[in-house]
């Protein structure tokens, strides 16, 4: 299943790119610069490369997201990129072009972090109905029609996700109870990120996941 994930991730990464050089051209290998220093969180890593590239890793499954700056290309060696601090086998690679948008947010506890980061506009679909949200900003976005209900984790509305050009689904580990949904999403070229904030032992480790999403959304300064 890993291979399909990888190719799906690559396809999804090509969405929304406007680089005139075509999708086959690749950039030179990346040069590692530094890593985000974390105080409490143990389940993710963020590594920075020269030229504005970033590699986000979720440690429990080894999955990686390569963020490619606007108008840049993914490097030739993208598949081989591994966080210097990662242990174990690398998982799938998802390539996303910045700015990251059209997300399908199923892990509802993360919505608060997007609100803190002032990045609600990166999410266009979610896994809760308007009446089930306890976060006023999410309720309001659904009222305004800027946030659409795209089905719960076990029954996503694939048609809606595709029509909204969904770039990635952000799930919690519940998705592992329905592996067929994960496979179907990948088949449609929609990669899945499983967030593990609830697996952090230290309560402040959970809170620190805002920095993971800050890196994803290019809002590091708001996350600190």
Q: Which stretches of residues belong to each language-model region?
A:
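N-terminal hydrophobic or amphipathic helices and topogenic motifs
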Residues: 1-99
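Generic hydrophobic, helix-prone segments enriched in Leu/Val/Ile
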Residues: 44, 138-143, 212, 224
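Phenylalanine-focused residue identity feature
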Residues: 44, 114, 153, 188, ...
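A short, structured surface patch at a secondary-structure boundary
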Residues: 54-162, 168-175
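Extracytoplasmic substrate-binding proteins
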Residues: 146, 159, 163-224
């Amino acid at each position: 299943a890993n291979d399909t994930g990888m190719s799906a991730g690559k396809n999804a990464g090509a969405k929304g790119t406007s680089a005139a050089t075509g999708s086959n051209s690749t950039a030179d290998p990346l040069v590692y610069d530094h890593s985000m220093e974390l105080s409490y969180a143990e389940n993710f890593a963020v590594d920075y490369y020269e030229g504005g590239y970033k590699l986000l890793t979720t440690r429990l499954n080894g999955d990686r997201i390569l963020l490619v700056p606007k108008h840049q290309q993914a490097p030739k060696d993208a598949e081989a990129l591994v966080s210097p601090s990662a242990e174990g086998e690398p998982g799938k690679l998802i390539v996303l072009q910045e700015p990251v948008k059209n997300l399908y947010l199923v892990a509802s506890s993360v919505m608060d972090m997007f609100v803190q980061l002032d990045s609600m506009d990166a999410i266009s679909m979610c896994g809760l109905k308007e009446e089930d949200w306890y976060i006023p900003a999410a309720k309001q976005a659904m009222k305004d029609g800027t946030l659409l209900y795209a089905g719960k984790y076990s029954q996503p509305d694939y048609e809606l996700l595709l029509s909204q050009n969904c770039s990635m689904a952000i799930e919690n580990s519940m998705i592992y109870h329905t592996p067929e949904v994960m496979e179907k999403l990948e088949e449609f070229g929609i990669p899945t990120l499983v967030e593990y904030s609830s697996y952090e032992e230290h309560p402040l480790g959970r809170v620190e996941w805002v920095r993971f999403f800050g890196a994803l959304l290019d809002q590091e300064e708001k996350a600190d």
